[in-house]
Amino acid sequence: MSHTILLVQPTKRPEGRTYADYESVNECMEGVCKMYEEHLKRMNPNSPSITYDISQLFDFVDDLADLSCLVYRADTQTYQPYNKDWIKEKIYVLLRRQAQQAGK
């Protein structure tokens, strides 16, 4: 498990910047999914449930002014930065694994 910091800037306005930290990369990717789900709930307040596909989630990620991760590397005792493309790849792997486990 690698400590992971998620840096989020929803719009071009710098004062909207925020961050969250997680105990692992997977927890962080789940956090990005939850952030999108909260966005969908705000956009559809009267809907009893929400559904989406991965392309919609990726569009949301792409529409953020900035989204990046800092992942702790024990070997160098530093944080390695990663961009949106890396985040989308990790989300894809996470969701594919969850779908495979649900199908068992």
From Swiss-Prot:
It comes from Danio rerio. Homodimer. This is Enhancer of rudimentary homolog. Disulfide bonds: none annotated. May have a role in the cell cycle. PROSITE patterns: ER. Keywords: Cell cycle, Nucleus. Pfam families: ER (PF01133). It is found in: Nucleus. One of its GO terms (cellular component) is nucleus. The keyword Nucleus applies. The lineage of its organism: Eukaryota, Metazoa, Chordata, Craniata, Vertebrata. Its main location: nucleus. Belongs to the E(R) family.
